A protein has these predicted regions:
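Formylglycine-dependent sulfatase
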Residues: 1-257
Length: 257
C-alpha cells in the first residue's frame, strides 16, 4: 500500500525532527526515526498547482502543461486543469487493482473532467483549491468574483464555505475510514492537507496548545492527524506493508505568517 501525506506551504524547519525548538511533532518525528529523512527531495515548482501536477504525473510542470509565465496556479474561475492525457500515479495503480482515494486539497482543476475522480481516484473528499480563494476568505479585488469555497465528495459539491477549523479533523476521519474500508486489498491514499496555507485555522481542541501561536497549533494538529493515520495502519495490520511518505508542495509563505 502507499500513503502520501502532503502539506500546503509547510516549511522545512516547522517540524521538531528538523530542528524546530517549539512546535511538537511526535508522530512525524517517529516516522523520521523509524524510517528515513529525505533531505534532498526536490519539488517540481515553488507554488501549488505545478508542484502537485509534478507529484501526480512524475513530469516537469512545463511538460504537463500546468506552469506558465502569466498564471502560476489555477484559480476557482480557471477553465483548465490537468489534462486527460496525463498519466497519474492513481491511474496506474487503479489499473493494477489498487483502491485509490484522494482526501483534501487537489488544485489541479475545480470541475470535471479535471477532478481526482477523473484522474484515477475512486473517491474524493476535499476542497479543490487553496483555502484563501473565495471572497469570504480573501478581500482582494481579484477574489470578488470567485465562487464560495466548495467541499466536494467525489464529483458533487456537498457544502459551501465549510468551517475551516474542522477541515483537518474531517479530512482525517475520511482518510482513516478509507484505510479501514480497504484494509483487505491494496490501496493508494493521497492525503493532501489544506494547511498550513493561510488563512490559518485549527480545531478548538488545539487552539493555544503550542508555543508558536496559531501556526504552531495548526502544525501540531497535522501531526495529530499523522498519528491517526499511522494508528489506523497499525490496528489493521498494515504497518509492515505500507509505504508512508510525509512531504509538502513547497516551502512556507513567510510574509503571511
Amino acid at each position: 500500500n502507499f500513503v502520501i501525506i502532503f502539506c500546503d506551504d509547510m516549511g522545512y524547519g516547522d517540524l521538531s525532527c528538523y530542528g524546530n525548538p517549539t512546535i511538537r511533532t511526535p508522530n512525524i518525528d517517529r516516522m523520521a526515526c523509524e524510517g528515513m529523512k529525505l533531505t534532498q527531495y526536490y519539488v517540481g515548482a515553488g507554488v501549488s498547482t505545478p508542484s502537485r501536477a509534478a507529484l501526480m504525473t512524475g513530469r516537469l510542470p512545463v511538460r504537463n502543461g500546468l506552469y506558465g509565465d502569466r498564471v502560476a496556479v489555477l484559480f476557482p474561475n480557471s477553465k483548465a486543469g490537468l489534462g486527460q492525457d496525463e498519466v497519474t500515479i492513481a491511474k496506474v495503480l487503479q489499473q493494477n487493482g489498487y483502491a485509490t482515494g484522494c482526501v483534501g486539497k487537489w488544485h489541479l482543476g475545480a470541475f470535471s473532467p479535471y477532478l481526482p475522480t477523473d484522474h484515477g481516484f475512486d473517491t474524493y473528499f476535499g476542497i479543490p483549491y487553496s483555502n484563501d480563494m473565495s471572497p469570504v476568505q480573501n478581500k482582494g479585488a481579484h477574489a470578488r468574483n470567485f465562487p464560495s469555497t466548495p467541499l466536494i465528495l467525489d464529483g458533487k459539491q456537498i457544502e459551501s464555505e465549510p468551517d475551516q477549523g474542522e477541515l483537518t479533523r474531517r479530512y482525517t476521519e475520511k482518510a482513516v475510514s478509507f484505510i479501514k474500508d480497504h484494509s483487505k486489498e491494496p490501496f493508494f491514499l493521497y492525503f493532501a492537507h489544506t494547511f498550513p496555507h493561510i488563512p490559518l485555522y485549527t480545531n478548538a481542541r488545539f487552539e493555544g496548545t503550542s508555543k508558536r501561536g496559531l501556526y504552531g497549533d495548526v502544525v501540531e494538529e497535522i501531526d495529530w492527524s499523522v498519528g491517526e493515520v499511522l494508528k489506523a495502519l497499525r490496528e489493521n495490520g498494515l504497518d509492515e506493508n505500507t509505504f508512508v511518505i510525509f512531504t509538502r508542495d513547497n516551502g512556507p509563505w513567510l510574509t503571511g505568517h
